Amino acid sequence: MAKRTKKVGIVGKYGTRYGASLRKMVKKIEISQHAKYTCSFCGKTKMKRKAVGIWHCGSCMKTVAGGAWTYNTTSAVTVKSAIRRLKELKDQ
């Protein structure tokens, strides 16, 4: 069978419905939510989304709460770096 979604990718299932700009937004979200992420516990690229905000590693079998569409949210990364920086200041 011929490849039908060269430009639109994963949002080809919507056809011509909902408008091009909305489909582009949804494409970005759907690509990130279906991607595999690196597990912060075992380091393998096995972290997959189970449900909204629930992520499961197929290697070490850990289940963690994360972002709705991505494993790490921007605010979580900011908080994690701030905590790490404060721990370093405390140790000095």
UniProtKB/Swiss-Prot annotation:
Name of the protein: Large ribosomal subunit protein eL43
GO terms of biological process kind: translation
Function of the molecule: Component of the large ribosomal subunit. The ribosome is a large ribonucleoprotein complex responsible for the synthesis of proteins in the cell.
Superkingdom field: Eukaryota
Keyword Metal-binding among UniProt keywords: yes
Sorted UniProt keywords: Cytoplasm, Metal-binding, Ribonucleoprotein, Ribosomal protein, Zinc, Zinc-finger
Record's subcellular location: Cytoplasm
Cellular component annotations (GO), alphabetically ordered: cytosolic large ribosomal subunit
Binding site for Zn(2+): C39, C42, C57, C60
GO MF annotations in UniProt: structural constituent of ribosome; zinc ion binding
Classification via Pfam families: Ribosomal_L37ae
Ranges annotated as C4-type zinc finger: 39-60
Family under the similarity heading: Belongs to the eukaryotic ribosomal protein eL43 family.
Major location (coarse): cytoplasm
NCBIfam families reported in the protein's UniProt record: eL43_euk_arch, PRK03976.1
Organism annotation: Gallus gallus
Subunit description: Component of the large ribosomal subunit.
